[in-house]
Amino acid sequence: MTNPIIAFKNVSKVFEDSNTVVLKDINFELEEGKFYTLLGASGSGKSTILNIIAGLLEASTGDIYLDGKRINDVPTNKRDVHTVFQNYALFPHMTVFENVAFPLKLKKMDKKEIQKRVQETLKMVRLEGFEKRAIQKLSGGQRQRVAIARAIINQPKVVLLDEPLSALDLKLRTEMQYELRELQQRLGITFVFVTHDQEEALAMSDWIFVMNEGEIVQSGTPVDIYDEPINHFVATFIGESNILSGKMIEDYLVEFNGKRFEAVDGGMRPNESVQVVIRPEDLQITLPDEGKLQVKVDTQLFRGVHYEIIAYDDLGNEWMIHSTRKAIEGEVIGLDFTPEDIHIMRLNETEEEFDARIEEYVDTDDHEDGLINAIEEERNEENL
């Protein structure tokens, strides 16, 4: 990567009064014009990173760079970034226009230019005609748009978003995901988004940093992280997973549940203990004698687009299955899956070791042919 817009080099943060370590040797580089997400549970350190970028907190050790310049000692108001907070931090006594225009007035910009810039920005966030509206009379989604408009009106190099969608209802939150992503792509400004919501991260991001206990556990594209989680924490934090103990017999051959199965992973020691991950949506229900494994249905819930079925095998392992077909509690069913559906996780593998192994042994060709080409390829394979 050339000329990262933001870089952290060996950054840590310790709150001295409580001797609490909240960030541990954080290193990353962010490319200009991308949508990045810091994803983690409460207390993982994600908001601390955001506040350090903004200048609201100082790093205990390490260096922070913005567009190639070290900014550790640069005050907040001198950094070319803008933060959208969870509560939006709007001025309740001001109108929509006055809120959005506020950063420009601080720069003592010409009134005509302010008028032009505010109108252009409100159009971008679909708030034309709301200039005179009082903040108290806006819906949650409209307040969100005002906060974003104020953040982008100065055309900062980076926009920081600290869980800005968490207060919205589900439908509005989903709509705002589309709007935020589309706006970021149209503006070409780097967005750094903080959330604990895995679905938000997967839906909007170019690149995700998964955080846990002050460390970046794994980073990658949404597809990479979902399909190839590095460890048990990531596999369970990002989506639902069936995780079993297993043994890697050799490259591309794994043993679990007392049986051996073809896999697509390699680069491990013969007979190395591993964990096996199969996603619920990758399990196909078949007749018992046609499945690779047999399980007994225990319970099920209807989730709208699928049934979530809980079943157990003869060894007592719990299996979650997503199926459009309804099961019968107590019946024995077969489970089928392909080698590509099996993901192998080594124990205590670092991200550097993981990335090197994945690059060498796993087919990560993520070229995008589109839906039509994909359908045509499937039909051609069926006709062979």
From Swiss-Prot:
This entry's Enzyme Commission designation comes to: 7.6.2.11
Q: Name one Pfam family in it.
A: ABC_tran
Q: Which ranges carry the ABC transporter domain?
A: 6-238
Q: Write the record's keywords in alphabetical order, separated by commas.
A: ATP-binding, Cell membrane, Membrane, Nucleotide-binding, Translocase, Transport
Q: Report which reactions are catalysed by this protein.
A: ATP + H2O + polyamine-[polyamine-binding protein]Side 1 = ADP + phosphate + polyamineSide 2 + [polyamine-binding protein]Side 1
**Cross-referenced PROSITE patterns:** ABC_TRANSPORTER_1, ABC_TRANSPORTER_2, POTA
Keyword Zinc-finger found:
no
Q: Which GO terms describe its molecular function?
A: ABC-type polyamine transporter activity; ATP binding; ATP hydrolysis activity
Highest taxon listed in the record's lineage = Bacteria
Query: Where primarily located?
Result: membrane
Any single GO CC term annotated in Swiss-Prot or TrEMBL for this entry: ATP-binding cassette (ABC) transporter complex
The entry's localization annotation reads: Cell membrane
Q: Which InterPro entries match?
A: AAA+_ATPase, ABC_SmlMolc_Importer, ABC_transporter-like_ATP-bd, ABC_transporter-like_CS, Mo/tungstate-bd_C_term_dom, P-loop_NTPase, PotA-like, Transp-assoc_OB_typ2
Which residues are involved in binding ATP? 40-47
Q: How does it sit in the membrane?
A: Peripheral membrane protein
On subunit structure and binding partners, the annotation says:
The complex is composed of two ATP-binding proteins (PotA), two transmembrane proteins (PotB and PotC) and a solute-binding protein (PotD).
Q: What does this protein do?
A: Part of the ABC transporter complex PotABCD involved in spermidine/putrescine import. Responsible for energy coupling to the transport system.
**Which family, according to UniProt?**
Belongs to the ABC transporter superfamily. Spermidine/putrescine importer (TC 3.A.1.11.1) family.
* Protein name as catalogued: Spermidine/putrescine import ATP-binding protein PotA
What is this organism's lineage?
Bacteria, Bacillati, Bacillota, Bacilli, Lactobacillales
Name the encoding gene, please: potA
